[in-house]
């Protein structure tokens, strides 16, 4: 048994406790409160003058998919052979022995969402995981799988500039993405009709399976969310148009210029993972990055989660969150 005493305890869901007590048994929080008796024989940590929080959660990372050291051999997050790869699964790229996992734990982060990068318009599924376990099966949190999609500079740079093929423009991004979703919708309809036919015709032959379309079908049926990478305000609105057109359950990733259209996003009850806040203007679509963005979005009614979009850099999640609070995000919403 471990007892943390005298610290300022941020319970997140039940207010803040000054000089609170946290009891931990076998790696799990057993009790949190003000006047909790300390069991005999418990190891006691005096946290006077310090803040105590639950394990932090990074809502968007690439931890252990883009491994460390950051060399080609460990780079498994972007399958840049086709802009539409919904059948890829982040769990097949994750390295539970990535040394960056231990680095991230030192920052108080115990859970991350990780998965494919943003080179492809549809990059495959990511998932949330606990930072413990020897295999991905032990680490993954069931029910957290989501489909990575991306708009903006990355897909058109990788395929248009790099491979001289579509998409080469933002128009191309939207068109190719829509086309894939429409194909998946048609595939679903065809399979449903085949199943009905099979019930009435004993010797009917089912259509050939298409793993790409099956994977996208899960998104269209709202079984899993679409997490759509978009920085610029116009890309954010394109993501919303397409998501609404196909009735997707979606989250906007990054939402860098979201503050420019915060009222529109708030009215739609958009959910966004915002960040990283500690980034440079390395691309044109990052030109108007603002530390005030998370606070403006949260106050407008957007559901905001802070993200680091990193690997080992995820250890600095508390710093990103602190910057958001300094620039106007309410502390309770930031945590």
Locations of the language-model features?
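Divalent metal-coordination and catalytic microenvironments
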Residues: 7, 22, 27, 49, ...
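Histidine-rich, glycine-flanked metal-binding segment
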Residues: 9, 13-53, 70
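Hydrophobic faces of well-ordered beta-strands that scaffold small-molecule active sites
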Residues: 55-59, 112-114, 147, 226-228, ...
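Active-site gating loops and adjacent loop-to-helix segments of metal-dependent hydrolytic enzymes
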Residues: 67-94, 135, 150, 155-162, ...
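His/Asp/Glu-enriched, well-ordered alpha-helical/loop segment
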Residues: 68-69, 75-81, 85-88, 225, ...
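Polyanionic/metal-chelating signatures
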Residues: 100, 105-250
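A general structural motif
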Residues: 208-209, 228-232, 254-256, 282-291
């Amino acid at each position: 048994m471990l007892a943390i005493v005298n610290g300022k305890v941020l319970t997140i869901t039940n207010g803040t406790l000054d000089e609170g007590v946290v009891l931990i048994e076998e790696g799990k929080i057993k009790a949190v409160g003000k006047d909790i008796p300390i069991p005999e024989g418990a190891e006691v940590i005096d946290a006077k003058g310090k803040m105590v929080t639950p394990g932090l959660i990074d809502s968007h990372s690439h931890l252990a998919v883009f491994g460390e050291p950051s060399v080609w051999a460990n780079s498994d997050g972007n399958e840049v052979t086709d802009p539409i790869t919904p059948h890829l699964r982040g769990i097949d790229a994750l390295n539970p022995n990535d040394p960056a996992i231990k680095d991230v734990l030192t920052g108080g982060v115990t859970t991350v969402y990780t998965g494919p990068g943003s080179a492809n318009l549809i990059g495959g599924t990511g998932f949330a995981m606990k930072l413990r376990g020897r295999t991905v099966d032990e680490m993954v949190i069931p029910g957290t799988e989501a489909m990575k999609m991306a708009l903006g500079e990355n897909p058109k740079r990788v395929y248009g500039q790099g491979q001289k093929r579509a998409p080469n423009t933002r128009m191309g991004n939207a068109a190719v993405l829509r086309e894939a979703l429409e194909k998946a919708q048609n595939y679903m309809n065809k399979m449903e009709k085949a199943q009905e036919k099979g019930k009435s015709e004993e010797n009917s032959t089912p259509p050939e399976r298409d793993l790409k379309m099956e994977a996208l079908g899960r998104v269209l049926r709202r079984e899993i969310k679409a997490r759509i990478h978009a920085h610029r305000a116009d890309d954010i609105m394109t993501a919303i148009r397409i998501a609404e057109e196909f009735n997707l359950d979606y989250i906007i990733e990054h939402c860098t210029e979201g503050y420019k259209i915060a009222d529109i996003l708030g009215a739609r009850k958009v959910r966004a993972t915002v960040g990283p806040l500690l980034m440079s203007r390395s691309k044109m679509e990052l030109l108007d990055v603002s530390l005030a963005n998370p606070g403006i979005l949260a106050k407008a009614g957007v559901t905001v989660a802070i993200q680091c979009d990193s690997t080992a850099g995820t250890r600095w999640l508390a710093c990103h969150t602190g910057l958001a609070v300094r620039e106007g995000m309410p502390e309770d919403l930031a945590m």
